[in-house]
Amino acid sequence: LEQEDFEVEIDEKTVLVLDTSKPIFDREPQDFSFFDALEIESAGFGLNTILPALEMASSDDKIIGISIKNMSAAGGTSNLIALRNGLKKFKESGKFIKAYSDGYTQADYFLASIADSIFVHPEGLVDFRGLSAEVMYYKSAQEKSGVTMEVIRQGKYKSAVEPYLFDKMSNENRIQIKTILSDVWSEMVDD
């Protein structure tokens, strides 16, 4: 996007509000004019719009900070990490970031943790559960329905087809998933 796509009139000492109540996508959803006629609200925001806007805001002397309004930071861990990194760059410009929510999920708090100050409603909820992974297995269902799968697999650490071959997780897949979750958790905690 070009800079003129973002140009708006900004007053002195402006605080930007980042409302995360809608999903955050890699790319902005396409704007189809027929949605306007149906009065359908925007489905969410794209990192391709948010990150350049944060970069421009970091160098705009009229903008003094950002207020993150966390109502449910939906968008997947990778998108939240990218957004948080964009906020970190904004903060490195010497401007403040504040965060407020009626309650924080783990994802909300991860995003808000880049802020200088985090506020929660006095009767709000903070819900941390850690990370988990679930795998659905189909072998028994296939046997009951008479369906058989023809699978070719080489090596122990090839788990994509496991749900069709087994009724439970193999030790190798358990190790892989545990490693991925540990890496993601470490990234979240270290930041």
Predicted segments, located by residue:
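Small-residue-centered hinge/linker elements
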Residues: 1-191
